[in-house]
Swiss-Prot record:
Name the record gives this protein: Elongation factor G
Pfam families the UniProt entry points to: EF-G_D2, EFG_C, EFG_III, EFG_IV, GTP_EFTU
Species annotation: Lacticaseibacillus casei (strain BL23)
SUPFAM superfamilies attached to this UniProt entry: EF-G C-terminal domain-like, P-loop containing nucleoside triphosphate hydrolases, Ribosomal protein S5 domain 2-like, Translation proteins
Principal subcellular localisation of the protein: cytoplasm
Lineage of source species: Bacteria, Bacillati, Bacillota, Bacilli, Lactobacillales
Length: 700
């Protein structure tokens, strides 16, 4: 018998909470869970006892690493919340959660307003078309300034953001909020942990400011809604319901961002934030259709939510749970799925059985018999499904848009303390790289070293920490290494001829290949331009494969060769002695020969580095950036501090956190994201080649 859906789709919300590190995101989530009746005792992040931060590393560091998905209930609505990390090393977690959300709350610190990482996640949310509310948190903090935070939304994000609430007081005088639509004030009782408040008329000393803010709000909504504009111009009454409906529509269309105020820590304003989630953020029925592709025909398909449609879901996270093993978090876009049934992994084209289905509450779980359209849940039993895979009805395969996964930019060598731990290390690394596609582990074929690669030093620290805790592997980690690449800068042609015809079965392969530089980010492109069968068709894939394998080991210092086009245009073969293996070797020889005249260069990752520091340290900060081969691209004032935008090679950024701390007496902060690859200066290229043994010897 089919199970009954508990909440209709229009009363479902899938939301994320996103912010700069330390803006109070986890505390806000905590309070939402507390007021929706999910927790009985509030955990404070800075005491290491938060509900959402469930990995031991997160509780120790007071930061959120993995986006735990939690279900809460408010006013007859189901709200699925995904907690996202605010640290830039974990952008894949943010991308992942934004891909499966319908709406988001952006949390700002009332003292700092929009911070660098807020800008990053805001940009990502815009890319994925996610409607947002803004919660100006920490209104009780010294230096809290609601108007300043509003200004930063306009200046730094160019967001059409407008207050739907106004704070009453600030810092230790913060008492509550004024609802600028209903024109009522909500004053909190200090002793009741925010569970009780009085709704009263707007206090006299706020009446004038509140009325002006109310009028500004109506004007702002009129700018994005023709119906409100007509009434406004005619001087007609606009009802609260009409105003809310117009705000909802404009918010869902990404034309308007409602702003609310509060203090999660002091338990003020969280219930009104929940009301705004219900009032203004979309249900799965309100969002634009999801794009999918039919793998059989290649046709684009639009998916809309509905239980009566074939099942389609995206696996957006894989996690290893200490009690139930491998959990696959899924977002259901259409249809329903019962525990125990089969699904098709359309990405890998294989069938898998879903053993059990769980609804997650941070790290508690509740078994459920079935999931419905719009749900977020965790499945047990999917052995071959990885992040970004599409799971569909067996008879209706679809590929949903997958995630953009950035390549790792930093690597370190890792070796277990004892030989016995090697197997455990291998298992641990395999599991961690399944969970996190930006974390890669590989063995260097020449040295036998195990290398791990990721998005930053903190990312790798946490992975090594997890190996120790979850897989009981004690390991030594080497110095961080930069993930260099190589490329060609000139067009050239070369022959590769491999002949071995003395005794036994001979070998013969002969190719002429033209190499040209490709556009940045386009990768390797191979073209077969053979005419008249001078290289038989069955050997063409071997030529391409031989090039790929040789490119993986580079031509200068052993780093992968990228962004090159190769055109096979001539060659010869031997009726008896030619083989795939011979053409593979010939192709690698052509690459090696071409490298002498192709202007081969080593590329290094260039990071976009944003430093925020008080004005008085500006000279030191800029001096340090220049000393690290960096380019300052621009500066802007951030309150009484300065933000310095720069491009700096990753190789020069190791240990920068310590340098910045001491230069600014602990008051400077920075964020760093990968931007592009660039050729290293000649002198540094020579050093790298020398250090790596002067180029790679290809095996004959």
């Amino acid at each position: 018998m089919a199970n009954k859906r508990e909440f209709p789709l229009d009363r479902t919300r899938n939301i994320g909470i996103m912010a700069h590190i330390d803006a109070g995101k986890t505390t806000t989530t905590e309070r939402i869970l507390y007021y929706t009746g999910k927790i009985h005792k509030i955990g404070e992040t800075h005491e290491g006892a938060s509900q959402m931060d469930w990995m031991p590393q997160e509780q120790e560091r007071g930061i959120t690493i993995t986006s735990a998905a939690t279900t809460a209930f408010w006013k007859d609505h189901r709200v699925n919340i995904i907690d996202t990390p605010g640290h830039v090393d974990f952008t894949i977690e943010v991308e992942r959660s934004l891909r499966v959300l319908d709406g988001a709350i952006t949390v700002l610190d009332a003292q700092s307003g929009v911070e660098p990482q807020t800008e990053n996640v805001w940009r990502q949310a815009t890319t994925y078309g996610v409607p947002r509310l803004v919660f100006v948190n920490k209104m009780d903090k010294i230096g809290a300034d609601f108007d300043y935070s509003m200004t930063t939304l306009h200046d730094r994000l160019q967001a059409n953001a407008h207050a739907v609430q106004m704070p009453i007081g600030a810092e230790d005088k913060f008492e509550g909020v004024i609802d600028l639509i209903e024109m009522k004030a909500d004053l909190y009782d200090e002793d009741e942990l925010g569970t009780k408040w009085d709704t009263v008329d707007v206090p006299d000393d706020y009446k004038e400011a509140a009325q002006k803010a109310h009028n500004d709000l109506i004007e702002a909504v009129a700018d994005v809604d023709d119906g409100i504009m007509d009434k406004y111009l005619e001087g007609e009454e606009i009802s609260n319901a009409e105003l809310k409906a117009a705000i909802r529509k404009a918010t869902i269309n990404l034309e308007f961002y409602p702003v609310l105020a509060g203090s999660a820590f002091k338990n003020k304003g969280v219930q009104m934030l929940l009301d705004a989630v219900i009032d203004y953020l979309p249900s799965p029925l309100d969002v634009r259709p999801y794009h999918a592709t039919d793998p059989d025909t290649g046709d684009a398909v639009e998916l809309t939510a509905g239980d009566d449609k074939p099942f389609a879901a995206l696996a957006f996270k894989v996690a290893t749970d200490p009690f139930v093993g491998r959990l696959t978090y899924i977002r259901v876009y259409s249809g329903t799925l019962e525990a125990g049934s089969y699904v098709l992994n359309a990405t890998k084209d294989n069938r898998e059985r879903v053993g059990r289905l769980l609804q997650m509450h941070s790290n508690h779980r509740e078994e459920i018999p079935e999931v419905f359209s719009g749900d977020i849940a965790a499945a047990i039993g999917l052995k071959n499904t990885t992040t970004g895979d599409s799971l569909t009805d067996v008879d209706h395969p679809l590929i949903l848009e997958s995630l953009d996964v950035p390549d790792p930019v930093i690597q370190v060598s890792i070796e277990p303390d004892s030989k016995e731990d090697q197997d455990k290390l291998d298992v641990g690394l395999q599991k961690l790289s399944e969970e996190d596609p930006t974390f890669k582990a590989e063995t260097n074929p020449e040295t036998g070293e195990t290398l791990i690669a990721g998005m930053g030093e903190l990312h790798l620290d946490i992975m090594v920490d997890r190996l120790k805790r979850e897989f009981k592997v004690a390991a030594k980690v080497g110095e961080p290494q930069v993930a260099y690449r190589e490329t060609f800068t000139k067009e050239t042609s070369a022959q590769g001829k491999f002949v071995r015809q003395s005794g036994g079965k001979g070998q013969y392969g002969d190719v002429w290949i033209e190499f040209t530089p490709n556009e940045e980010g386009k990768g390797f492109e191979f073209e077969n331009a053979i005419v008249g069968g001078v290289v038989p068709r069955e050997y063409i894939p071997a030529v391409e494969q031989g090039l790929k394998e040789a490119m993986a080991n580079g031509v200068l210092a052993g780093y992968p060769l990228i962004d090159v086009k190769a055109k096979l245009y001539d060659g010869s073969y031997h009726e008896v002695d030619s083989s795939e293996a011979a053409f593979k070797v010939a192709a690698s020889m052509a690459l090696k020969n071409a490298s002498k005249s192709a202007g081969a260069v080593i590329l290094e990752p260039i990071m976009h580095v944003e430093v925020v520091a008080p004005e008085e340290y500006l000279g030191d900060v800029m001096g340090q950036i220049t000393a690290r081969r960096g380019r300052v691209e621009g500066m802007e004032a951030r309150g009484n501090a300065q933000l310095v935008n720069s491009m700096v090679p990753l190789a020069e950024m190791f240990g920068y956190a310590t340098t910045l701390r001491s230069a600014t007496q602990g008051r400077g902060t920075f964020t760093m994201t990968f931007d592009h690859y660039e050729a290293v200066p000649k002198s540094i290229q020579a050093e790298i080649i020398k250090k790596n043994g002067g180029g790679v010897a290809t095996k004959d």
